[in-house]
Curated annotation (Swiss-Prot):
Source domain of life: Bacteria
Keyword check for Translocase: no
CC annotations in GO: cytosol
GO molecular function: DNA binding
Cross-referenced Gene3D superfamilies: 1.10.10.200, 3.30.70.980
Protein name according to UniProt: Probable transcriptional regulatory protein ACP_0521
Organism: Acidobacterium capsulatum (strain ATCC 51196 / DSM 11244 / BCRC 80197 / JCM 7670 / NBRC 15755 / NCIMB 13165 / 161)
Cell compartments where the protein resides: Cytoplasm
A Gene Ontology BP annotation from the UniProt entry: regulation of DNA-templated transcription
Keywords: Cytoplasm, DNA-binding, Transcription, Transcription regulation
InterPro entries attached to this UniProt entry: Integrase-like_N (IPR017856), TACO1_YebC-like_2nd/3rd_dom (IPR048300), TACO1_YebC_N (IPR049083), Transcrip_reg_TACO1-like (IPR002876), Transcrip_reg_TACO1-like_dom3 (IPR026564), YebC-like (IPR029072)
Pfam families reported for this sequence: TACO1_YebC_N (PF20772), Transcrip_reg (PF01709)
Keyword DNA-binding part of the UniProt annotation: yes
């Protein structure tokens, strides 16, 4: 199983947990609000366009999307959010990147540091683990939706990098700047992705066993549960995640 497939596995699990906890709307609204700072017109703001597409995929009401955009542009009052990226290590030397959006920087720093230390990890300095990851666009589509040759032609013509078959799915990788064009080309061909977002993909993965693996899972869950956390990335072997999670 490839590295990015392992990433997709945990993201699917994470998405299901988020939905259960009723947190996904909050995270999406924050992303729309932050994105809209660069302009409220999605046609001229790729990040906002991606955020709106993600919200619509989760059936967020249009009114919620509109209000989030207006808070970002300043048309409506609202919390002033700051984006913070944390880097650190989990149990067994697993590299972890946490992306947070908060209206209270000091609180967020304190609580994220505590989450690491309580679960066998430690918060690191900026760029301490970033070099272990690559920022990539990831688009996952069902093999039932398109054959390899057709999809490969779509991907390459739109500027994508790679197409891999993983189980029942095709996984498309792009550079971040090409992501928007590739995902649009896929949708224009009548293919709806199961996953479509810009993410961080680890270059290598770390396997853990037993109590250390369980502790790493607790760290990931604690971070993902935090109200300010938008995304958590790690190079914890995702096959191990499946085994530990059962």
């Amino acid at each position: 199983m490839s590295g990015h497939s392992k990433w997709a596995t945990i993201k699917h699990k994470k998405g299901a947990l988020d939905a259960k906890r009723g947190k996904i709307f909050t995270r999406l609204i924050k992303e729309i609000t932050i994105s809209a700072r660069a302009g409220g017109d999605p046609d001229g703001n790729p990040r906002l366009r991606t955020a709106i597409a993600a919200a619509k995929a989760e059936n967020m009401p249009q009114d919620n999307i509109k209000r989030a955009i207006q808070r970002g542009t300043g048309e409506l009052p609202g919390a002033v959010y700051e984006e913070i990226t944390f880097e650190g290590y989990g149990p067994g030397g697993v590299a972890v990147i946490v992306e947070a959006t908060t209206d209270n920087r000091n609180r967020a720093v304190s609580e994220i540091r505590h989450a690491f230390s309580k679960n066998g990890g430690n918060l690191g300095e900026p760029n301490s683990v970033r070099f272990m990851f690559q920022k990539k666009g990831l688009i996952v589509v069902s093999k039932d939706a398109a054959d390899e040759e057709k999809l490969m032609n779509i991907v390459l013509e739109a500027g994508g990098d790679d197409l891999n078959g993983e189980g029942e799915n095709w996984e498309i990788l792009t550079e971040p700047q090409a992501y928007d064009a590739v995902v649009q080309a896929v949708r224009d061909a009548g293919i709806e992705p199961q996953v479509a977002e810009v993410t961080m993909i680890a270059s290598t993965y770390t396997k853990l066993e037993g109590a250390t693996a369980n502790q790493m899972m607790r760290l990931l869950e604690t971070l993902e549960d935090h109200d300010d956390v938008q995304n958590v990335y790690s190079n914890f072997d995702m096959e191990q995640v499946e085994e530990v999670a059962g």
